[in-house]
Each structure stands twice: as structure tokens, then as C-alpha cells.
Amino acid sequence: MNLTLKIWRQKDAKSKGKMEMLDVLNEELVNKGEEPVVFDHDCREGICGACSLQINGEPHGPDRLITTCQLHMRMFKDGDTIFIEPFRAKAFPVVKDLMVDRSAFDRIQHAGGYVSVNTSGN
């Protein structure tokens, strides 16, 4: 399957962001000896929300009730272009590339807030 990924790049919270194709971007980064695309992750089990991504303009992607780490590439068609961007909201400012400042979410958790999620699929 051939897919084109367009990844959001942003140096810091004050810089203007831009979209770039992952294959071209990665080739340029490797050739220049620069760091890879920055993104946040935590559990990789679909319960933490650390990914904080939008896929094709949809939070976590086009499937309902799943997170980005649960999104299977097989749902896309050969030749699709996939836009991968960070959540861009006042409460979650972009730190760099695909990583956002989740301290607002962390404050809710520290105050005792939680979300119950069934991860077994039943």
C-alpha cells in the first residue's frame, strides 16, 4: 500500500506551523543530520489521550471512539494522502511539531478527574 503522509511541523509555540510530506521531510532531516518529527506518546493502549492528534482534520482520526494509536492503516486506500496535525486549541498550545502542552489535562487528572474507558473491545 502506498500512502502519502503530510505531517505538521512547528518549531515552537510562537512559530508559524506548516505541513510537509513525511517521506520528503524525513529524507531532508536525515541528510541534514537534524532531529525527527516530535510527537507525544504515553500508553499506546488507547486510554491516555497523549497523542493529541488530528488525522485528516478529525480528532484521533475518522473512526469513532478510538484514539490515534488504535487507528489501523488498513482503513485507508492505496494512494490516500493523510494529514497528521496536532490539536490546536488555546488549552493545548503546540510545543513543537505534533507535541502539545497537555498541562491543562494533567491538572484535571491531578484534581481527581478521570475518564473510564473499556479497552477490551467488549
Ranges and model annotations:
Residues 1-122:
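Signature of N-terminal electron-transfer/Fe-S-associated modules in redox systems
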